[in-house]
Amino acid sequence: IAIVACGTAYHAGMVGKYALESLTRLPVWVDLSSEFRYRNPLVSRDTLVIAVSQSGETADTLAAVREAKKKGATIVSVCNVVGSSLTRESNFVFYTLAGPEIGVASTKAYTAQLLMFYMLALEIGRIRKTLPSGFYAQALKTLNRLPILQSQVLKKKKLVEAIAQRHHHFGSFLFLGRNVNYPSALEGALKLKEISYIPAEGYAAGEMKHGPIALIDEYRAVVCIAVAS
């Protein structure tokens, strides 16, 4: 399985890789759409290419899909806009149907893309019998609780405002995450740059000691994503 996407959708694809490999035991790689077609990728009739785009009109992703189709790959798109160019180029389509993104940044579409990847991984894992006993039913219950959990997070607006007030003066930010939280670190850095115009980087937590630590000082804030430990 190959996943191609740009920007926020690329980060969703990275999470998708973790989910698909973990639950289906199939090899998955993720490529930036803008790089995919320039390296003569190893794609064949046995390759499933999953193209992710909120709008379905991302030029680089469309070009990557056309390159994969030339090589005989089957194309599945994860898209938010019905009837967009990407969906017309695809063999199969998963519509996220998250509604239009009002701001520049992709937010609810990103969340829907993550959910779509987990659902796909669960279904393939169920068919391939690679899931632990009882995992499928428990995972569906957990996913169905997401709207409640998200609403609880949104109620923390005052806490978020207080944290922003304490940290808005920092000149740059470093976001750190490990495993499935690494793409979230990249996404957090992208969102801060996109919306607040503050320089930010996302790194795998274990890589901090291999360079980025040299830039840590009193002018740089560090955000650690450690949701379970």
Regions found by a protein language model. Give the residues of each.
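Glycine-rich phosphate-binding loops that contact phosphosugars or nucleotide phosphates
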Residues: 2-145, 225-228
